[in-house]
Amino acid sequence: MKTKAGFYDYSGNADDKTLSEILARLKASASAKKAPFSPQRLLLAMINEAALCIQEHIATPTDIDIAVLAGIGFPQSRGGILQYADEIGIDVILNQLNELCGVYGERFFPAPLIRRMVAAGFLGKKTKRGFLEHA
């Protein structure tokens, strides 16, 4: 049974002023720059969001990797998005997020967990410790 208390506006009003205002602000903001399609930019955003989920105890790294493998068809050969991040290097991820943050704004601001991992030397496979532990 629907309670009509969720995400959607069930008032029957086709013109949602709140949504229109948000979209207008996004279009006017600097972060709405036109840019060519970049798979790496999408992956970095997903890695950053995954780090926030781990930091907020919403999911474990293993949960996230299984979800992207089963849910969005992430290549099994990569082992999941966090396995992929560990292969690239958490320090490299941090540097790339910082660059994107400078260009596209705060939506690419690196998750505090990523900053702490780099500061602690948890850089991924090259240090045998990242989002996951590596033998």
Go through the PLM ranges and name each one:
Residues 1-135:
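N-terminal glycine-rich phosphate-binding loop for ADP-containing cofactors
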